[in-house]
């Protein structure tokens, strides 16, 4: 049984350090420009107020819809945005293991990996050396490539020893022809993305400008839905007021089936659809085969 306990930094050219662990929970949506003012700027010229009282839509409403839009975007694209420390257990499959222990993390993008270990039961059997890790940040893929020399470093493990038989020899178990074992791989990493650091330049570990745009438009949809109900009242298509022979008539596109801002919402849906297509291509699609 191998019990490598290699110490030192987990970061290197194959796993760059993008964020300090102690700073992970300090990032907020405002750091990414996802603010109330950003949403209001995108409905410039449209005053979202209650016509009876003149009261503006409160900022708390905008904030809740921004949070909902972020959650919706994460589910649509199968990504995470705010940085977070994640701990996962992955099953052993012989085909994946023979492909340099391929692991597809449950969340993406991956900002940096902290630890990859092999477990059996409740114990750690082997901690993979940092220099073996191959990290593909954007799709959330990890692979392990041992040193190809006869001696793989301080642990004295060679490539032939690391990939012998159908079961991971590193576990200390004999090769038994099994193709599956549950939760043998333990992975700790930081998932999410960082705010843009330079205008006009998109880095893989930073928020894509199209993603920011889509989130704002998702939040804006909720604002326009509320505004459509406020124009003259929910479900009212037209209204007339007469005082001392002076009349005023207001006709809208609103009906019992459609709100007053339906046309704006249709346009937003088209914009969101186009942004989604491009972002889905950028972040990729998670495909699972059984």
Briefly describe each language-model feature range.
Residues 226-242, 246:
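Short conserved catalytic/interaction loops centered on acidic-Pro-aromatic/His motifs
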